């Protein structure tokens, strides 16, 4: 199968804020020079306290999201408690490392809250797992990092985090041809996973453009 036949995701980000995390993606999937889809899901709810963003092959990404979601649910049923972000990150890293010679063509961000606080982990195709205060993946990540390095600060409010996420992804969509077609975003705080509505994202975009 040639590169032009493969549907690939592109730009995602995650931010650790004072009261939780913000995760966001754009929605374009490309097949070589062709825009394959304009409403691609790259942000997955794994559990009430955990979410995953994906960049890379859509098929690999969707399968890994289903796999992790099932493992987390089984853990909760067996142990009667939520899986920690560190444990989920280690599990996902081990799965990916086991395929390092025939790797999944993805880069993942795993984020959420647990008893130890808020976390964002970046996971690569070889099984590397790195926590940080902010992370980005995909072809538009250089543009996102430019914005985040300049504007991110510790203890951002979730409102500030949502605005920064929209600003950073907008910068990527303006310059990276493989990124575009809108933004999907969630927050995870003490109330659990919450999807940010398209109307709220549009309002933030309007405010930033003013």
What residues fall within each predicted segment?
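Long, low-complexity N-terminal extensions
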Residues: 1-210
């Amino acid at each position: 199968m040639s590169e032009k036949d493969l549907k690939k995701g592109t730009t995602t980000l995650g931010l650790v804020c004072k009261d939780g995390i913000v995760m966001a993606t754009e929605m374009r999937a490309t097949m070589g020079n062709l825009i394959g889809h304009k409403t691609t899901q790259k942000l997955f709810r794994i559990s009430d306290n955990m979410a995953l963003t994906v960049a890379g092959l859509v098929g690999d990404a969707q399968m890994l999201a289903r796999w992790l979601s099932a493992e987390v649910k089984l853990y909760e049923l067996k142990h009667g408690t939520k899986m920690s972000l560190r444990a989920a990150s280690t599990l996902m890293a081990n799965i990916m490392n086991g395929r390092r010679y025939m790797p999944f063509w993805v880069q993942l961000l795993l984020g959420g809250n647990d008893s130890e606080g808020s976390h964002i982990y970046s996971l690569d195709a070889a099984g590397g797992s790195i926590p940080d205060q902010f992370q980005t993946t995909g072809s538009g990540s250089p543009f996102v990092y430019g914005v985040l390095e300049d504007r991110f600060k510790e203890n951002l409010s979730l409102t500030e985090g949502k605005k920064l996420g929209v600003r950073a992804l907008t910068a990527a969509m303006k310059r990276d041809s493989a990124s575009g077609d809108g933004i999907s975003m969630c927050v995870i705080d003490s109330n659990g996973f919450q999807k940010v509505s398209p109307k709220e994202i549009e309002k933030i975009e309007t405010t930033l453009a003013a």
